Amino acid sequence: DFINFVKELSELNNQNDSNIDKLKKAKMKNDATVEDNLVALIAKIGEKITIRRVKFFDKSKGANFSYVHSAVEKGIGKIISVVKLDGVSKNNEQVGNKIAMHVAATSPLAIDKEGINKNLIDKELEIIKEEIKNSGKPAEMVDKISKGKIEKFLNDNSLLNQTWIMDPKKKVSDILKENSSADKEIKVLNFVKYKVG
């Protein structure tokens, strides 16, 4: 029942532009709304289920690649990641699936450093500076050390700057370059990772 609900929900999401409110009000095949079907499903299986987030990747400009970890059925699992790439051709499609797997394993916050939320960076910098001060380092060293640590935070959390999980000597950006052709550069347009729970 749950798997069938999820499959139909996914189809409806594609028709509702990832608008969670529209999705909850949408009619399912049995003519009841998603919300009503969700209540009935919760009553039937006795598990708390919520629809917290949705995302839709259209098929215009670029190609979508996915990875499902701990799959219970095709396209359904405990962790799923989807990556939208531009510049991928038939002979280098495997790179899309590998990058989707990388996203599932590493949980980047953004494609590049500039995409990471400024408030999050400020908060992280505050924590880093406090840790350095509490470690007994001289006050004049705090800024210098914190710059290096915040740079590491940005690299670790921006997809293009992350260390490639399949070869720690490379970054994700290196993998994209290696798989690009002379006339087609592979670019990450978007990505998402969802985990059950």
Identify the residue ranges that each predicted region occupies:
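N-terminal assembly/interaction segments in proteins that build large macromolecular machines
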Residues: 1-197
